[in-house]
Regions:
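Short active-site loop/helix that positions an aromatic residue
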Residues: 162-174
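ADP-ribosyltransferase catalytic core
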Residues: 176-184
Length: 200
């Protein structure tokens, strides 16, 4: 895979990405000031270190330019896999979560929460944060297409790491890894999988 200097993120070899359906993944949550927008070209490169640590590059994030993440389930028989997701696509699906636990955009967080997340994710610490852990499902889309069963949309629920995921998207990560049960991985790739800068 390409290994150019402008590549924005990394993935593991088993986290293959499928071409998703054509959808509008612009943010559905307004904010008083915009999140940093990815400004790059080229394709992601895959280069996890030997211990399986992922490094996610951030764009226009003054505090630090990258974040390290590790797997939640590291045992071979865990039946969970890593999927490299498009940040905007994943968060759009997460906004559809029917539960009451859907966080607002980062600019609406209390300043102490933003500071705490930033310190938690800062690289160079002994403890490496775990990647977000999600559940994925689909439902009928609004409108006629969904009514007749011809159109569906993805729904993401966070088991852990929603603050991390939303902060990464705000900080300019175009894509990042998440962990999901193997039975849901294919659908997650279809609706949210990273396929390049043009996807965002």
């Amino acid at each position: 895979m390409p290994t150019g200097p402008l590549a924005p993120c990394f993935s593991l070899t088993h986290a293959s990405v499928l071409l998703p359906d054509t959808m509008d993944f612009s943010s559905s949550t307004s904010a008083p000031f915009p999140a940093p927008a990815p400004m790059f070209s080229g394709s992601p490169r895959t280069a996890p270190d030997e211990s399986g640590i992922w490094t996610v590059e951030l764009v226009d994030h003054e505090a630090f330019s990258s974040v390290q993440l590790k797997r939640v389930f590291s045992l071979p028989d865990s039946r969970h896999v890593v999927v490299l997701v498009d940040a905007k696509a994943l968060l759009r699906c997460a906004d559809r979560d029917p539960t009451d636990y859907v966080l607002p955009a980062v600019p609406y967080w209390p300043s102490g929460k933003v500071k705490g997340l930033r310190e938690f994710l800062e690289p160079g610490q002994t403890r490496i944060p775990e990647m977000p852990y999600v559940l994925f499902s689909t439902r009928r889309s609004p409108g006629l297409g969904g009514l007749v069963g011809l159109s569906r949309e993805g729904v993401v629920s966070f088991r852990n790491g929603q603050h991390r995921a939303r902060y990464l998207g705000f900080a300019g990560a175009s894509c990042f890894p998440v962990e999901v049960h193997e039975t849901e991985a294919e659908s997650l790739r279809k609706y949210c999988g990273w396929v390049g800068a043009e996807r965002s």
